[in-house]
Amino acid sequence: MASSHTPMMQQYLRIKTDYPDMLLFYRMGDFYELFFDDAKRASQLLDLTLTHRGQSADKPIPMAGVPYHAVENYLARLLKKGESVAICEQIGDPATSKGPVERQVTRIITPGTVTDEALLDARKDNILLAIHTQKQKIGIAWVDLGGGRFHLQELTEEHQLNAELVRLQPAELLCKESTPLPSFCSNFAVKFRPGWEFDASNAHKLLCEQFSVTDLSAFGEQNYPTALIAAGALLAYLKTTQKQSLPHLTTLTLEQSEDYLQLDASTQRHLELFENIHGGGEHCLLSILDKTACAMGSRLLKRWLGKPLKQHAIIQTRQQAIKEIIFLQQDVSLHQLIKQCADVERIVSRIALKSARPRDLVSLLQTLILLPAIHDELQENKTLLINEIKKEISPLPLLQQLLETAIIDNPPMLIRDGGVIAPGFDEELDELRNLSSNAHETLVKLEQEEKNRTGLSTLKLGYNSVQGFYIELSKAQAQNAPPHFHRKQTLKNVERYITPELKLFEDKVLSAQSKALAREKWLYDNLLEEIQQYIPELSDLAKSLAQLDVLVTLTERAQSLNWNCPNLVPESGIMIQAGRHPVIEPLLQERFIANDLELKPNQNMLLITGPNMGGKSTYMRQTALIVLLAHIGSFVPADEVRLGPLDRIFTRIGASDDLSSGRSTFMVEMTETAQILRQATSQSLVLIDEIGRGTSTYDGMALAYASCAFLASTIKAYTLFSTHYLELTELPKDFSCIRNVHLQASIKTGQIVFLYRVEEGCANRSYGLEVAELAGIPKEVLKLAHEHLNQIQDTQSILVQTQIIKPPTSPILTELKKIDPDRLTAKEALDLIYKLKQLECVESIN
């Protein structure tokens, strides 16, 4: 550190050394200043004016600053850009400091650890996620610090990690330094952490300390070794940034994929669950569903959509609760009550972190006051899930009484401003306040005494925050001021003085004010500690209010949108009668054309043909969305639905270049298709829209044929497969499990008319030129296209059906299918090897 730096700059550089990767906001009077590279970066990110202060190595030191009273706005902008900030405050008294005022970092804010209400999106979880990889395993741990949730999951494939990142949308990723990351991680704010934080023994120690246990076996650590290391690194980071205990993180939730209907990253995007295809929040499934009354409910609804349940029994408890709310007509009254509730979940987190503001406590009190009314409203609803909710929203009279007696009804925003603790709560505080508040009466009395003593008629006593208390005389009478009047200030028309008696009074009053503020701050901190004992009950209350809000919202959606309860059955299959698209239907001015669908084990694929814009993709997507809605417990847009067990939803709909990874449209399409063919099972729902585009007609048709046949006959997945290759409509002749359907269209007065009805059989043409005309292709181009099409149709088909060759049956595979390996003797196994070898020789000759 250069000795030529001023003491203040030396202090800055010393503090900055501990926070090299963060922007250091260094408090100087009414501003937070930034220096050197921090100043340059902040000026670019925040459009600040870059100035200079002093010199370093004979060069001016760059400086930029923001007003302290507006700092929250600047912090919010930095967090959105993935930046982290260390707030360095003046903690010493400038009046008594020798040299620079003592300063220290009092607050660290990172994108994934922020809990301040002003810096968060109320309706989105704010996730901090750590990734660790070892031995072909990917362990992830994530925490929502504002919600008190801590989750772990073990993965085996990168595409699973991609799916979780798309679902969770973490604000910040933690990785071990020098760890290579997949390209899709570049969409997030990544922090590389030292290797020692990703240590198994260190992780075990930190987790045991956090959860006050000596062993983690109760959490199932043996099944999550990699994820536990990630969890340890995450806790180490939280301890560094929060500088305190985290009492609201009380347990680990171990995510198990078999509990949920799996949705990969492509499926989440293709179905437009959380945002539309352009990245906006409107016209997606969440935007149609989210009519929640409170922010807690909104966040929970999004979590439900991202993790649809597999267990029918749990789903049915949600259905029963919704049915009963409808029957008892409770949705409107409950919605109005919940709407008045505060964001208890995030208030609890701020209480745990001792950062709750006075108005947080008032909002919490107002929610506690509402609990008896909510509880009474639910009294008649005896369903299993509502009974569980009622247990958690019981009144908390002791906490309510504490808050009512401790905090005034309308406190200032910050405790530092004082006037937060209610009169009568603390006797010592009341005495200090009385001394301060009675100052005016004492001042009037002193003024009259001095007037009587001196005979000076213009004498007045006053006060301001700069000069303190003073005696004021007009210029005319100032010459008669007695000797014990000591001049304090000269103004144009008056002189101001201080006397020993007035100085004594000033010290007493100002001391009382200072002591009152200190006492109030101490009382407030103690109050937060006392409330912390209620964190378990308040956390349960928050979860139950959020769950009730989602159930009430799904009730309202079911009634407003004319949705019905789906039937979940143990028998395999999917049946939808008069299904509609949940997002498109509410946006249409005209009536939506409903369509039926049935898939069953012996007829598990629909081969869908029809014109572009004819409704094929809508029909496919609405099927997947109806299935997904059913698995979160929602009613669905259909007259009747019957669903058997399902494990995953896959989609391959639309494609575009992935420039960041250097992949063409065709490569993206093939990668998604390969993932489906490798992972789908007989209980998966698969949507494939147009395989084979982006390559030659022959290659494309061959790939479409093979994929279609493999899904239908080998995997036996429930599949909706749309295509423009009309030659594929011959497949049902070879595979009885495939059925042709098409979207109707007709030509009227030379114009194509889309009927949007799904009918049996295949389309007899694609209507491509008619759709091109709608798109505005010039008439001379269309005329030429018609002439060329007629020439092709008159001479030959683009691909003769006989060129699609049914895969030959292998004698070796036929023989292997007959074998039960568990029942073979050693002699039979040896004979079998010779037989298979002979068959292999025959195949090679043929």
From Swiss-Prot:
Disulfide bonds: none annotated. ATP binds at G610, P611, N612, M613, G614, G615, K616, S617. Keywords: ATP-binding, DNA damage, DNA repair, DNA-binding, Nucleotide-binding. SUPFAM superfamilies: DNA repair protein MutS, domain I (SSF55271), DNA repair protein MutS, domain II (SSF53150), DNA repair protein MutS, domain III (SSF48334), P-loop containing nucleoside triphosphate hydrolases (SSF52540). One of its GO terms (molecular function) is ATP binding. It comes from the Bacteria. One of its GO terms (biological process) is mismatch repair. CDD domains: ABC_MutS1. One of its GO terms (cellular component) is cytosol. Belongs to the DNA mismatch repair MutS family. This protein is involved in the repair of mismatches in DNA. It is possible that it carries out the mismatch recognition step. This protein has a weak ATPase activity. This is DNA mismatch repair protein MutS. The gene is mutS.
